[in-house]
C-alpha cells in the first residue's frame, strides 16, 4: 500500500462570503466550470448543508464538465459534494444527495472509465457512529443503484468535517477510531482518507485564538496518525479571507501557509474569487499548488497540555462577552445580504449551530481553567447566525471579533500559565496573531461599537484593546471610507440593534446597502 497518495490542493466552495456577488443555485454549475477553467482549482464542492441546492446539481456539474471542457471529472477535476448531516438536518435529504452522486457517476461512467465522484463531505461530525452510519448509507445507495440501474461504482468515501474546538482536540482519536471501526464494519480500511477541519465555527463558539490553536492541535494529531497507520491521510482546511475565519488571502499567504503547515488542501471561497482584486485568486491557487503540503509541526505532550489550557482561557474570556451580545449580533446579521440560496431554519441568520458540548475540552484542561470555561458558557442556545454573518455583523459595528476576549485572556494566561507560556503562544503556537490583529484594527472603531454594547461588555473590550495595543504596538486607525460609513449609519444600525424595534422597508434596504458597501471595503461579507 502506497503512502504517497496525492490529493487535490484547492477546493472551490459555495460559501456565501462575497460582499459583491450573489450567486443563485442555477448559476452554480457554471461556477464549477469557472473554478477549474478560470481560477485553476482542482476540486469543487457542491454544497447541500443548510442550503437549497437542487439534488441534481451533482449531475449537472459532471455533465457540463464532460460536454463543455476537456477535463475529465474524477481525474482532472474532482467533484466532492457536502451532504447534509442526518443528525442535524434529516436523513431523507442526505440519502437524496447520495442518490444524485450515484446518478452523476452513472453518467460519467457512460462517457469514460473514470468515476466522477469518489468522496463526499459529512458536516458537523462529532462521533465515529455518525461517520460509519453515513458511509453505510452510501454503501446502501450504491447497492440500490447497482440493482436498479446497473451502476457499478466504487463506493465514495466519507470526509468527516470537524468544526468545533472540543471535536478538533479529539480529531486524531476520531479519525483513528473511524479507520479501525471501518475495517471491522466494511472488511478493510480505506487506502486514502481525508479529514476536513473548519476554522469558522470553532471561532464563533470559542473565539479567534482558541479556534486557531484547536485547528493546529488537530493538524498535529492527524499528521501523527499518518505516520502511525497504513492509511494515507490528508487534511482539508476550510478558511475564509478575514482573520476570524482563517485569513486566507494572497496578501497573507505567507503567514497562512506557515501557520497551518501540514494541510494538503485549502478552500477557495467566494470572497477571494469575487471580492478581491482581479488575479489574486488565481495567484493564490498557483501558490497553493507550489506549497502544499508542507511538513507538519508535531507537538510534544507538554506542548499539547499547554495549548489546551490556552484554549480554555481564551475560550472562556470570549464567551463571557459574546453571550451578552447575542441579541445585537442576531439583529444585525439579519440585515446583511443573503449571497446564496440558504435553507431557513432557526435563528435570524438561517441554519444555525448549537452550543457545542465542551466536556471533551474541559476534561483536558487544568481544573481551574476548566471550571472557568464551564462557567463562561451560555446556559441555553443563543441561536447565533452562521459564522459569515456573525463575523460581518461585528465588523459592521466597528468591533472585529478577533479582539473579543483576546487581551484579557492574554493577561490571564500570563498569570495562570506564566510568561514563558505566553511567549510560546506568540512565537510558536500562533506567530501570525500580530498580523491578524493589525489587519482587524483597520476596521475597529469603539466609538461606534459602544452604542451597541452593554456597559459591562464595553469595559471588558476596552481592556482587551488596551492590552493588545500595548503588546503588539497596534495602531488603531480605521480606514477613512469605512469610518464614514460607520458614522453615517449609526442611528439606523442602533435601531436595528435595539430589541423590539422594526424598520420600514426603505430604511432596511438603506442599512443593507451600507453594510454591503462596508463588506466591499474589507473585501468579504464576513
UniProtKB/Swiss-Prot annotation:
The gene is ppcA. It comes from the Archaea. One of its GO terms (biological process) is oxaloacetate metabolic process. Belongs to the PEPCase type 2 family. Keywords: Carbon dioxide fixation, Lyase, Magnesium. This is Phosphoenolpyruvate carboxylase. It catalyses: oxaloacetate + phosphate = phosphoenolpyruvate + hydrogencarbonate. NCBIfam families: PEPCase_arch. The keyword Magnesium applies. Transmembrane segments: none annotated. GO terms for molecular function: magnesium ion binding; phosphoenolpyruvate carboxylase activity.
Amino acid at each position: 500500500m502506497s503512502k504517497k497518495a496525492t490529493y487535490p490542493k484547492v477546493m472551490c466552495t459555495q460559501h456565501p462570503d462575497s460582499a459583491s456577488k450573489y450567486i443563485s443555485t442555477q448559476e452554480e454549475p457554471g461556477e464549477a466550470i469557472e473554478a477549474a477553467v478560470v481560477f485553476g482549482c482542482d476540486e469543487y464542492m457542491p454544497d447541500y448543508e443548510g442550503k437549497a441546492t437542487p439534488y441534481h446539481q451533482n449531475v449537472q456539474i459532471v455533465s457540463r464538465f464532460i460536454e463543455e471542457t476537456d477535463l475529465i471529472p474524477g481525474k482532472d477535476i474532482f467533484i466532492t459534494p457536502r451532504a447534509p448531516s442526518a443528525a442535524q438536518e434529516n436523513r431523507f435529504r442526505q440519502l437524496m444527495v447520495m442518490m444524485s452522486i450515484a446518478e452523476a457517476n452513472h453518467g460519467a461512467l457512460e462517457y469514460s472509465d473514470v468515476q466522477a465522484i469518489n468522496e463526499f463531505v459529512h458536516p458537523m461530525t462529532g462521533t465515529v457512529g455518525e461517520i460509519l452510519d453515513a458511509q453505510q448509507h452510501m454503501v446502501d445507495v450504491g447497492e440500490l443503484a447497482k440493482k436498479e440501474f446497473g451502476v457499478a461504482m466504487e463506493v465514495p468515501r466519507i470526509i468527516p468535517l470537524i468544526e468545533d474546538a472540543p471535536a478538533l482536540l479529539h480529531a486524531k482519536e476520531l479519525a483513528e477510531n473511524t479507520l479501525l471501526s471501518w475495517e471491522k464494519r466494511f472488511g478493510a480500511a480505506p487506502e486514502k482518507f481525508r479529514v476536513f477541519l473548519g476554522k469558522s465555527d470553532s471561532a464563533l463558539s470559542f473565539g479567534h485564538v482558541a479556534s486557531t490553536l484547536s485547528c493546529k492541535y488537530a493538524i498535529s494529531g492527524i499528521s501523527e496518525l499518518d505516520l502511525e497507520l497504513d492509511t494515507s491521510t490528508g487534511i482539508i482546511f476550510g478558511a475564509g479571507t478575514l482573520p476570524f475565519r482563517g485569513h486566507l488571502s494572497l496578501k497573507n499567504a505567507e503567514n497562512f501557509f506557515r501557520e497551518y503547515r501540514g494541510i494538503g488542501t485549502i478552500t477557495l471561497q467566494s470572497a477571494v474569487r469575487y471580492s478581491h482584486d482581479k488575479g489574486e485568486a488565481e495567484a493564490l491557487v498557483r501558490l497553493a499548488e507550489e506549497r502544499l503540503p508542507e511538513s507538519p509541526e508535531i507537538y510534544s505532550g507538554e506542548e499539547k497540555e499547554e495549548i489546551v489550557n490556552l484554549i480554555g482561557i481564551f475560550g472562556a474570556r470570549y464567551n463571557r462577552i459574546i453571550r451578552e451580545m447575542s441579541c445585537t449580533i442576531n439583529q444585525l446579521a439579519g440585515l446583511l445580504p443573503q449571497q446564496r440560496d440558504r435553507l431557513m431554519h432557526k435563528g435570524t441568520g438561517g441554519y444555525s449551530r448549537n452550543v457545542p458540548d465542551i466536556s471533551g475540552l474541559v476534561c483536558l484542561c487544568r481544573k481551574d481553567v476548566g471550571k472557568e470555561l464551564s462557567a463562561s458558557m451560555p446556559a441555553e442556545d443563543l441561536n447565533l447566525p452562521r459564522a459569515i454573518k456573525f463575523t460581518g455583523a461585528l465588523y459592521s459595528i466597528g468591533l472585529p471579533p478577533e479582539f473579543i476576549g483576546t487581551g484579557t485572556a492574554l493577561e490571564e494566561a500570563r498569570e495562570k500559565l506564566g510568561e514563558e507560556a505566553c511567549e510560546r503562544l506568540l512565537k510558536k503556537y500562533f506567530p501570525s496573531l500580530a498580523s491578524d490583529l493589525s489587519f482587524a484594527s483597520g476596521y475597529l472603531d469603539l466609538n461606534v461599537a459602544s452604542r451597541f454594547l452593554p456597559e459591562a461588555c464595553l469595559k471588558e473590550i476596552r481592556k482587551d484593546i488596551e492590552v493588545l495595543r500595548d503588546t503588539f504596538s497596534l495602531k488603531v486607525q480605521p480606514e477613512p471610507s469605512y469610518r464614514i460609513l460607520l458614522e453615517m449609519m449609526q442611528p439606523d444600525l442602533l435601531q436595528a440593534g435595539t430589541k423590539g424595534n422594526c424598520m420600514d422597508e426603505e430604511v432596511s434596504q438603506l442599512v443593507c446597502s451600507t453594510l454591503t458597501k462596508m463588506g466591499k471595503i474589507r473585501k468579504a461579507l464576513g
